[in-house]
């Protein structure tokens, strides 16, 4: 007679590990045996996957997740949600958060949410709040966080010790950071104001996307940009497969990065591509991803490969703005490249600015921003790591060209009809218009309250649905083949077209013919 199975209570970390194994094809039966639990428990974990991941992602401490065994909700659940949202935003900004500040804010949200009863934001409440969300520490002394040079030095020293201990090379050290991009904003002769564009009555927010850059410390492995737009399939994509885009494209109703998208990107894109790159360099498949404390970045325990060899590490809130590598001119260089590219394209097409603006699509912007990222030189990136890794070497043979300057863009403007007289001040405003745009949604107190109460912005969802209903244009093989024939005829007539260009089109024609034969064998 078999003995009764001993009751096993899993930690949150155990549940996360089980979820990862399930996503990788592990069976409920096998996992039940490994963890000494019933298959029903495994199925319950699968059922509550998103809830567990969301809870873990919002936690502040990996070590506490390894101890915590329940996700017991607060007695005041709406207040708890509002406080966590507020806390994460304050931490991301590097603002000081003390016990008294938390207590005062909790009292404000309690009454703003219209909650009943007596509420005392005591030290006991604060302790329970921290425990529920695995928050390591709250700065009780209310010290100033921004601009803390001592904290910068401490972090850099600790990080270098960590790198040495883990035996990591610069090739294995990565940074990722998000930014907002007003992709359709063009300069005006008179002014460039945040929220307005050159077309009267047009709101910049309607053409805002989130762009995330990721690269290693040498600048020799730049991953494809991760872009978040509002629609799952924007109209300009037509029948384009998103897998064939020059960026990794995701959608979110506000075009913001969120916890779910970041986790997908880490698991499905970052980890596999880093493994492939390190393998090609003959290096151990081990890497660290350095991140700031954005509310959209999950807990370190969530951002970890199955074998634990590729993982995330966080910059302290009080130093991120000072030393995060991509924030040291790298993202700014990419944006300047992008805007210079837009003006150059307009100049080449010879259109007036308004016509160019109307024709500019999100698909055009994705190709342009991908090119702009490609133009950022490895040496520009490696120099941005100097404060954290002063010993990093600049690779020989890499020429360093100064990033595109305002003067360079001004030269292009002088040849752009309608923009010849843009003032240097307005030009600089345009170039810097989204320099402080975060990649995550910053909520006001009233928005935090609505979200805590479960209210959503239905208009955004309806807008996305309306975009999705636009029919796609289908191009058949016969039509595509005719276009390539016409293009080849055109190239043959041009005496200055080089042979490689014609060969590319001929190869494309052969590919289309093969597709046509496979679809219609009788032709």
From Swiss-Prot:
Residue ranges occupied by any HTH psq-type domain in the UniProt entry: 1-52
DNA-binding region: 28-48, 100-132
Cross-referenced PROSITE patterns: HTH_CENPB, HTH_PSQ
Keyword DNA-binding: yes
Keywords for the protein's UniProt record, in alphabetical order: DNA-binding, Nucleus
Compartment(s) of residence: Nucleus
Broad class of the protein's primary localization: nucleus
Domain HTH CENPB-type: residue ranges: 67-139
Highest taxon in the source lineage: Eukaryota
Domain DDE-1 stretches: 168-385
Protein name: Jerky protein homolog-like
Organism annotation: Mus musculus (Mouse)
Upper lineage: Eukaryota, Metazoa, Chordata, Craniata, Vertebrata
Encoding gene (name): Jrkl
């Amino acid at each position: 007679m078999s003995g009764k199975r001993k009751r096993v209570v899993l930690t949150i970390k155990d549940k996360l590990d089980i979820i990862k194994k399930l996503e990788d094809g592990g069976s409920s039966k096998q996992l039940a045996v490994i963890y000494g639990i019933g298959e029903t428990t495994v199925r319950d974990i699968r059922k509550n996957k998103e809830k567990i991941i969301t809870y873990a992602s919002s936690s502040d401490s990996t070590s506490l997740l390894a101890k915590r065994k329940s996700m017991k909700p607060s007695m005041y659940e709406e207040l708890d949600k509002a406080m966590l949202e507020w806390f994460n935003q304050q931490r991301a900004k590097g603002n000081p958060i003390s016990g008294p500040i938390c207590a005062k804010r909790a009292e404000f949200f309690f009454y703003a949410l219209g909650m009943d009863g007596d509420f005392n934001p005591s030290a006991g409440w604060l302790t329970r709040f921290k425990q529920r969300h695995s928050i390591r520490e709250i700065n009780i002394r209310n010290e100033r966080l921004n601009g803390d040079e001592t904290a910068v030095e401490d972090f850099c020293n600790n990080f270098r010790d960590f790198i040495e201990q883990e035996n990591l090379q610069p090739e294995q050290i990565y940074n990722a950071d998000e930014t907002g991009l007003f992709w359709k904003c063009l300069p005006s002769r008179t002014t460039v104001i945040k929220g307005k564009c050159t077309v009267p009555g047009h709101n910049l927010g309607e053409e805002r996307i989130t762009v995330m850059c990721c690269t290693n410390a040498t600048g020799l492995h730049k991953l494809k940009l991760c872009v978040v737009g509002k629609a799952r399939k924007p109209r300009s994509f037509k029948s384009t497969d998103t897998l064939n885009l020059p960026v990794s494209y995701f959608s979110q109703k506000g075009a913001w990065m969120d916890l779910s998208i970041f986790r997908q990107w880490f698991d499905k894109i970052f980890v596999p591509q880093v493994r492939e790159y390190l393998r090609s360099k003959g290096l151990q498949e081990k890497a660290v991803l350095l991140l700031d404390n954005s509310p959209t970045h999950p807990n370190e325990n969530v951002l970890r490969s199955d074998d634990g060899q590729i993982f995330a590490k966080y910059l302290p809130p009080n130093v991120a703005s000072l030393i995060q590598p991509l924030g040291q001119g790298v993202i700014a260089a990419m944006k300047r490249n992008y805007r210079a590219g837009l003006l150059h394209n307009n100049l080449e097409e010879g259109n007036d600015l308004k016509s160019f603006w109307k024709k500019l699509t999100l698909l055009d912007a994705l190709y342009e921003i991908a090119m702009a990222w490609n133009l950022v030189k490895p040496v520009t990136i490696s120099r941005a790591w100097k404060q954290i890794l002063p010993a990093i070497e600049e690779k020989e043979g890499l020429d360093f060209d100064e990033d595109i300057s305002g003067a360079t863009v001004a030269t292009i403007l002088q040849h752009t009809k309608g923009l010849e007289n843009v003032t240097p001040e307005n030009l600089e405003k345009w170039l810097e218009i989204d320099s402080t745009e975060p990649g995550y949604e910053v909520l006001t107190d009233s928005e935090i309250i609505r979200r805590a109460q479960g209210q959503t912005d239905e208009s955004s969802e309806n807008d996305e649905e309306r975009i999705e209903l636009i029919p796609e244009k289908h191009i058949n093989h016969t039509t595509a083949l005719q276009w390539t024939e016409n293009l080849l005829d055109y190239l043959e007539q041009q005496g200055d077209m080089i042979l490689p260009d014609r060969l590319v089109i001929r190869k494309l024609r052969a590919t289309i013919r093969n597709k046509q034969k496979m679809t219609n064998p009788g032709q």
